[in-house]
């Protein structure tokens, strides 16, 4: 066995570093009984590394490439081209040339071969990289093959491969390349087999694409392919494409395109028997690798050859339940306005805090709704409740229920038992007294509890810290699920629903509660947005401080402020803001996310924008304007009601509900603020313990604790021992999860059920969502995916995936809101109503459909957006 060249049969599972992802998978496939793989061998990474290892020009250019940022596309292109030229000019090591000649004589010099790149960062379970390097078909002759080996080496530095590595965090120095030399087969048909449906992600449905000739035509998008769907050894769907072209190999080498005769273009590529045979092969390969596969196949004289198999890395993972039953899962992140992947410690804390049973998948949390959907008593309540906050979830759940036999409905006897335990409590129960002091007292009790936690935490160390946190989480749950607190929140929400329903019924006015909700008391989140305007007012008179803050890059700036006139006053104002709100950040329900207090420079761009866009005293003006609008709307509604039949009674009922709304609706944001405050205290204590673990050489980095569950961290602190494989495994998983888009609803088959909005009476080009804050507004769309990248001007419309309280400071600068995630009572909706901003949420793919800088019109009352 040569270290330069390995036959497919010689490749071992541990040799990724030698043969890359594609080569390793071909070696594995060759060892599966009954699977036909065209013969071939791999020119290992050793040959490539010897060829370029001592090349000074190559190393110099590689170092230059490593210094570039992904935005520098032109420079990346220039250096990548120079690297490719250097590689094409190198001599292939003699040992490689001799080994290739030996294997070619063994397999047949006269044969045609496919020459394929196989990078060490390709076809991995957590990063596909498919198609980033080059493939050459029907290459004949030793010298020709050697030249194409160099072309494959050079393709490691195509612009697309370099940029893809940069996007995925791979070091160019750490990636190597092998070249696969595989005997060509000349198929009548070829294509791609997915062992899970790539459209719906259903793991029980195989999807086969098939066309005539070589698969290159299909992969490169030259032809449409037949598509066959197979489920449980039965063909459940066939779409026969019009196939006008095919690519075939030429005897003298290379490939050629051929037109297909018109009378043959609609022929089915594979017979039913061949489709089912291919499906069985796919399931066999999937079982061997242990995960869904993307498989390239060829049909030659009734024999199916497999030329490649790689993991499908784009499928959303399924929550693990191994009971053989069907399950339906609902995303928690879509309700919490945080759909980012969470690290293991973040997931642990949220699971410890919540009262509802949840399961993990893809770095997110899901609730198993199966039992509640099976029960007539709870099904309608669940669907209607979720439907108010997210119509897409309601539509998806309705789709599942309408499928026969997917969810086992309860029998008549079970229905009787279920009625007694599953009927939700009536909303009239526990109606609180209409007294704003109740809210004041709840807030005061929460603040006292947090101060006590701070004092107690200072006395703990080691494993006692973790034990104490577990105890305190019970206290946190008592605060979060306090019956009086929940009653207050429900009273505010019910008042909002009542006002909207009755005002539309009696006066024909839609969403009247939106204006009435402006500038209410006790909304800790909207108060935070206004407080940052006040900080801007403190800084405004000091031009030296403003000039300094415009160039702040690290978090030591607070201590340096005192060298400027007004600097101490500015520092105190920022400190005061951080003392009250510094535990917040974007994605704050994940305890591992960096808080404003940990990185104060994060809030400086927002402050500078406020100084630029607003006059002194803007926070008080904004609050007063909102209050006057709300009072004016109340007066107008009551006057109109007075003239209706039973007007006096309607006025009294409405006044009471408006009072409920304005007294209670602001409090809805407070329990979460208390939870996040506690999380920050827990986090600070855990980071101190992590620092000790680093000092004791148990951890490499303090933030490695984020990749442990709470239970694992407890054990590490107790024993001072850690198997670092856990950290590496979770880091790789998190990298994958970050790239995935979580579904609102997913089944135990892995099928993603997507809901749809009703489009009646809307413009044809309208982008539809859920109306949550009334009004119509036109403006420049600013598509922002990370709050840190926000550069908003007064009057912009914010378009983003989701907003949570950490985004609130941006709301004072915008005049409209569009989000991909959200509901009537989620963060963005509540704050938009309070600030009087037209808003549409739950807009599927809003950040892709709307381009940054486009002028758009947001219809916050009707729930759609127009691109102008």
UniProtKB/Swiss-Prot annotation:
It catalyses: rifampicin + ATP + H2O = 21-phosphorifampicin + AMP + phosphate + 2 H(+). GO terms for biological process: response to antibiotic. One of its GO terms (molecular function) is ATP binding. It is an enzyme of class 2 (transferase). It holds the Pfam family PPDK_N. Residues 1-313 are annotated as: ATP-binding. Residues 326-756 are annotated as: Rifampicin-binding. It comes from the Bacteria. Residues 769-867 are annotated as: Swivel phosphohistidine. The keyword Nucleus does not apply. The active site is at residue 827. Keywords: Antibiotic resistance, ATP-binding, Kinase, Nucleotide-binding, Transferase. ATP binds at residues 22, 116, 131, 135, 182, 296, 308, 310. Belongs to the rifampicin phosphotransferase family. Catalyzes the phosphorylation of rifampicin, also known as rifampin (RIF), leading to its inactivation. Confers high level resistance to a variety of clinically used rifamycin antibiotics. Does not show phosphoenolpyruvate (PEP) synthase activity. Contains three domains: an N-terminal ATP-binding domain, a large central rifampicin (RIF)-binding domain and a small C-terminal swivel phosphohistidine domain that harbors the conserved histidine residue essential for phosphate transfer. This is Rifampicin phosphotransferase. It comes from Bacillus cereus (strain ATCC 14579 / DSM 31 / CCUG 7414 / JCM 2152 / NBRC 15305 / NCIMB 9373 / NCTC 2599 / NRRL B-3711). The lineage of its organism: Bacteria, Bacillati, Bacillota, Bacilli, Bacillales.
